[in-house]
């Protein structure tokens, strides 16, 4: 024996190896060597104990032997350190034990789940096997019944074939016998020999019982002679058909033959919907929906849109219910909940000061606020809506809105009347009721708000308050002094007379109104003014009407949305929130809103963006619908009318939205049937290069109202020759535009009659034609003037003179009482007794 007999060869330890055979399709196999490594579990408790045992004497030795102890450590300190060390070791042991227990629990849980999964899979396999066996048994019985019926039919046939058998008949009979024998063998199933059972093992009997009665001709692929002669082996059901039949039988056994009841759905139907989306919402096939539409005469594809009415017909045809929804439903997220009475709290009144221009509205408000706003207004007139809060002597807080009085600011006054609680109508005692006073009265009546009349400038010598009261009667405003219900107060903004009485009247009116609001809800307010600030971006002056607007709130206002970045009150101070009746400047918008838009606070940024997008699309659709409503005839008629109309294009940029609107409205009123002003674009903010490009393309001037052009815009204007005009007073702007538009008017031609001449004789002159010998009876006859030939006071000819002679000399003019000779240009039909009317044309420039 060798040295290695009975010894294991050397190798890597720590693992066990084995072989696993992987089977693939087409009989391919692959051997894989699998090595399993075992992990050595180290129990911390035992290790620690052993280690501790080895060093058990050290701490005591250290603590007992002062020479081995670290310097400066007392016995008590050493004992504490040792106790802490022992506690740490104990914790480590506990944690290790807990980890082992957790791992064991997880392993048990995994084993339990594996067993459950295996049991479930086994049950599923057994159930499927039972269903398969049942289906095969049913199929076998059906075949046997069919065979029995066929045999009975053959036996019942009348035996009329009793005639001498021919060789062909004998061959057919033998084939039939063989065929019957083959079928019997197939029905009974293939026999297995004992050797087959021994070879395949003990499970052969079970397989024979399962396969009993199965037709194996499809599997063996063999074809007997009798089958070939009989034709049975020709066209048979495919293997896929057999599988489908088995699947149907399995579903039938499981109860799948019951037809699923159709589910009726509520289909949300917008104004327009894509065909594929409609099919998806109905849970129907898209081709079925397209077929339904084609039956209606609509040739559509899956990606085409259809209107709501057509989609509703399709939904009804498929048996579902249509639920109409509108795109406007996105605005339902805006809180419109009615406030409970117990949540309402008193709020400050909102007072709008209105009246004619230069009647002292801003001066009166300055006197109340003890400020001086008039000095900062261009031209001494208000051109913006100002919002202020004033604290009265009794402690009450009042919110004032100062509106412009100029005729161009009608829309501003209308907005001021819509958001106010009380209107203070300022009328100058020395000027009485004026056009904008009447307009302010109409705005207050339309808004159904109470009115207080403040008769201003009573300190002037020409003041006549009684005339003001009388003039107001003409407009159905009856003051208390005239036995009416409207309060009237005589005040002087200059001397301060009557201001306390005015504030008392306002407080009394506010007390009667019982103004309340709920501060504990999402804010809602109105945009008083909006502008585009160079450093701060879009800024909106908002008057909070309900709720509390806080910094960080997400809001939607008109077609814009944003997040409150900062709130600035009327004193220029930053605040964190603004309650009801508080005017603030809001920063954080994504664009400049329109003055008069309503601000609503929403929950999320997505909601705000969705509402703003819907409003933008709705505005586009409205403009498109307005353009589409014009017929071709109307369009041609308008184009023909515009051919004779001269246009003055302008580009308007203003500091605030309200001023821009007022300028546009004022310019639209300029013009007549021959000339008009066309505003190409108006906006808020500084003049930019894009404005210059637009103006250059249309050969229009750029009007800047309280704004200036930036450096690139100025350079572009100089290069392209675009005129930029700056204004700070709306009077001057309107007057200049009106003068420029007047220059487009064609000059008016006026005729001045300068004389008459009577024809005394007619002479025929060769080379010249007929020449009239005339006597100037009135005025003077000039060679350059126009003439008309009158016969019996009827104009026969109008033209010019070819020649004017005095005796034989050509002269420029002939005075009254003198004789002369006249010949007409291209006209000879003159007679004795006709009268010649002499006139001159003069062009006069027209004004709008």
From Swiss-Prot:
Location of region: G2: 380-384
Region (G4): 456-459
Domain tr-type G: 346-514
Region (Disordered): 1-265
Bias (Basic and acidic residues) ranges: 89-162, 191-219
CDD domains: IF2_eIF5B (cd01887), IF2_mtIF2_II (cd03702), mtIF2_IVc (cd03692)
Region feature (G3): 402-405
Example of a GO cellular component annotation carried by this entry: cytosol
NCBIfam families, A to Z: IF-2 (TIGR00487), small_GTP (TIGR00231)
Higher taxonomy: Bacteria, Pseudomonadati, Pseudomonadota, Alphaproteobacteria, Rhodobacterales
Stored Gene3D superfamilies: P-loop containing nucleotide triphosphate hydrolases, Translation factors, Translation initiation factor IF- 2, domain 3
Name of the protein this chain belongs to: Translation initiation factor IF-2
UniProt-annotated stretches for the region G5: 492-494
Location in the cell: Cytoplasm
Matching SUPFAM superfamilies: Initiation factor IF2/eIF5b, domain 3 (SSF52156), P-loop containing nucleoside triphosphate hydrolases (SSF52540), Translation proteins (SSF50447)
GO MF entry, a single one: translation initiation factor activity
Statement: the UniProt record of this protein carries the keyword Nucleotide-binding: yes
Family, per entry: Belongs to the TRAFAC class translation factor GTPase superfamily. Classic translation factor GTPase family. IF-2 subfamily.
Comp. bias (Low complexity): 163-179
PANTHER family: TR-TYPE G DOMAIN-CONTAINING PROTEIN, TRANSLATION INITIATION FACTOR IF-2-RELATED
Stretches for region G1: 355-362
Role played: One of the essential components for the initiation of protein synthesis. Protects formylmethionyl-tRNA from spontaneous hydrolysis and promotes its binding to the 30S ribosomal subunits. Also involved in the hydrolysis of GTP during the formation of the 70S ribosomal complex.
